[in-house]
Design a protein with these regions (language model features):
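PLP-dependent enzyme catalytic core of the Aspartate aminotransferase-like
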Residues: 1-4, 10-12, 282-329
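Conserved PLP-dependent catalytic core of the aminotransferase class-I/II
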Residues: 35-44, 206-260
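Conserved PLP-anchoring active-site segment centered on the Schiff-base-forming lysine
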Residues: 64-82, 96
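Active-site phosphate-binding strand-loop segment of PLP-dependent enzymes
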Residues: 99-153
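Conserved C-terminal alpha-helix-loop-beta "cap" of PLP-dependent enzymes
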Residues: 242-296
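N-terminal glycine-rich, Lys/His-bearing helix-loop that initiates the first secondary-structure elements
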Residues: 1-22, 218-222, 226
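Conserved N-terminal alpha-helix of the aminotransferase class I/II PLP-enzyme fold
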Residues: 8-56, 60, 64
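Active-site PLP attachment segment
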Residues: 152-201
């Protein structure tokens, strides 16, 4: 299998956890404490809690933070956060939004005008993986920055959390790391040890290759010619990701067809979550739904030789042409 969708679909492993990590108020829980300390040390934070990476889970975080100040959310965050933020507003709470520009970057003018005390914004945009300069964001606001660190982490984030499904393939709780008293302390019996163990294990195994993007891009342009276009600048995306679009087809058509060739690609988060929805982020950039269905994202976790890359592109071009012919009939 040639897996080019790892940031959306993880390499799922068997889930194994020792009974040594089970929690009890009648023992010292040394093994869990060591695991927790290892996780906190890895990202230089002092506190760790677990919560549900879902609409209800993020709504809970928003409600907790609303007692302390105003909140802003980047429209380029995960589906679960966006849904939670919309529900938060529907309950009568105020919330500021940071929009996306046509080129996929965050609208920095929205950041400049923020009055928020807390911002949910990550070092990359979901789906396109356009990088976000959190250092610049931090220079423009005193707000606490809370980020998704699943695909990339930044030292300018004041708190980070992880998308368990995309890291492990299991819908376990998420881990949230922070300092001081940003969130309430969590009693040990409520901490999801299976999630802590699994996420840390997945992060240890996480591996990306940065040498493949330019080669794949050149070969794609060579193979597709005028049928390929780019909605975002590939120089502005994570070094191990490539985002592009193919004219006059729906991404799901080529995603499903290539799966039969054991080549796995994706359109974005709506694809990986089983929502059967085209990329929300592309639409938030100002493109119509039809364009968002053209979008395709690659992630590079393995180094391929030039012959292998050319073979993959050849298959991709062949399937694309076949789909176009069938659609024209």
């Amino acid at each position: 299998v040639i897996k080019l969708n790892s940031l959306q679909y993880p390499n799922v492993q068997n889930l194994h956890i020792s009974s040594e990590y089970s929690l009890s108020i009648l023992k010292n829980n040394d093994e869990f404490t060591k695991l927790e300390d290892e996780f906190k040390k890895k990202y230089s934070f002092s506190q760790l809690i677990t919560f549900s990476f879902s609409q209800s889970g993020f709504l809970g975080l928003l409600l907790d933070l609303s007692k302390k100040g105003k909140i802003a959310v980047s429209i380029g965050e995960s589906y679960a956060i966006i849904q939670a933020a919309k529900q938060f507003e529907s309950l009568g709470f105020e919330l500021e939004w940071i929009g996306l520009q046509k080129d996929g970057n965050i609208n920095i003018e929205d950041v400049k005008s923020l009055k928020a005390d807390f911002i949910f914004i990550s070092s990359y945009i979901i789906d396109t993986f356009v990088k976000v300069d959190l250092e610049q964001v931090k220079s423009l606001t005193n707000a606490i920055i809370i980020s998704n660190a699943s695909a990339n982490s930044s030292k300018f984030s004041d708190a980070i959390y992880f998308d368990t499904y995309k890291l492990t393939g299991f819908s376990l709780s998420s881990v949230l790391l922070f300092d001081n008293d940003l969130f309430d302390e969590q009693v040990i019996g409520f901490k999801d040890i299976t999630a802590v163990y699994s996420i840390l294990d997945a992060l240890k195994k996480q591996f990306f290759v940065t040498s493949q993007k330019d080669i794949f891009k050149d070969k794609l342009i060579e193979g597709f010619g005028d049928d390929i276009y780019f909605l975002v600048d590939s120089n502005q995306t994570l070094e191990y990701s490539l985002h592009f679009a193919l004219k006059n087809i729906k991404a799901r058509e080529i995603i499903r067809t290539l799966a039969l060739d054991s080549i796995h690609i994706t359109n974005g988060e709506g694809c990986s979550l089983g929502l059967s929805m085209p990329s929300r982020v592309i639409q938030e950039m100002g493109y119509e739904e039809l364009i968002s269905r053209n979008a395709i994202s690659f992630t590079f976790c393995k180094e391929f030789d030039i012959e292998k890359i050319e073979k993959v592109i050849k298959i991709l071009v062949k399937r694309y042409k076949q789909i176009k012919v069938l659609n024209e009939q």
